[in-house]
Amino acid sequence: MPKLQIELPISEANWIKHIETLQNIENIVGTKQNITTALKTSIIRDLPKEPFGILLSGGVDSSIIAKICKDQEAPFRCFCVGIKGSEDLKVSKEIARILKLELITKEFELDEIEQLLLKVIKILPKPIIRDDNYIEYMVKVSVSAVLLSAMSLGDEKIFYSGIGAEELFAGYQRHVKSVSERGTWRGIDIKGLQEESWEGLKRMNNLVISRDKLISDSMRKEIVSPYIDDKLIILAMSLPTDKKIDSNSNKKILREIAKDLGVPKEASERKKKGAQYGSSFDKAITKLTKINGFKLKKRYLDSLIAKKKV
């Protein structure tokens, strides 16, 4: 089955149709062994011969990619950004030390963050921010700032990303809700884990893939996402709930795979943090909001969007 790579644009309708086709495939049983094989294959199959980058946050998803590429003796460097003292920088440096990876990092100052946000806002489509969607746009802007800044640190044209793993292996807070109290998350009615995970995959093109493609295209670079692979999706989505999540842990089987591959526990056992939090970019935006005289981040965002018109 071919890997879905985000350098090729796909319409929202065609993306949803493709995911629904995968959803209708039956009689597939995912195991730790065949998921490991599928993940390795997805990463190794199209490894570039020229030097490439890996966006290493220090989380389990990107650390698995780095470990497999290291085992293949592939020509790559890792990249991580954040505010001074951020968790992503701290953990990624430790992972790089243990695995002997070449890691390029940058600590950003507050004034640099505002300039990054302005760059990102110019790249992304102009939003209509309302009270019920500004958090979604805030996430889009802050994560895009992390992506743009990390990819700017190197002249590599191809960067590997761990996006997709959260949906496949139940890494988000709404997945926790789906096996506990249900309810809503950012205005979305939470369903059972299986249904919620498929719905999350259907939303990925609009919320994540198209965002990352806009950023990478603006730099004339390409993002490769090995977790967004047909065979891997089918196998992972066939897993029962208890293989993915319980009251103590999420992404359970992926963490087990990471340990088997030799990924350090600093990554394999690390709890999920969004890029905006692990990098502390979200904290920086909070500080910038106050410095610029606003009480709400939404108002600060509005002021930055207004500058886009100038």
Set out the residue ranges of the language-model regions:
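PAPS-dependent sulfotransferase catalytic core
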Residues: 182-183, 265-310
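ATP-dependent adenylate-handling active sites, centered on carboxylate activation for C-N bond formation
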Residues: 25-261, 276-288
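Glycine-centered secondary-structure boundary/capping sites
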Residues: 2-9, 125, 170, 219-223, ...
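N-terminal glutamine amidotransferase
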Residues: 1-23, 43, 147
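Extended hydrophobic/Leu-rich segments
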Residues: 15-29, 300-304
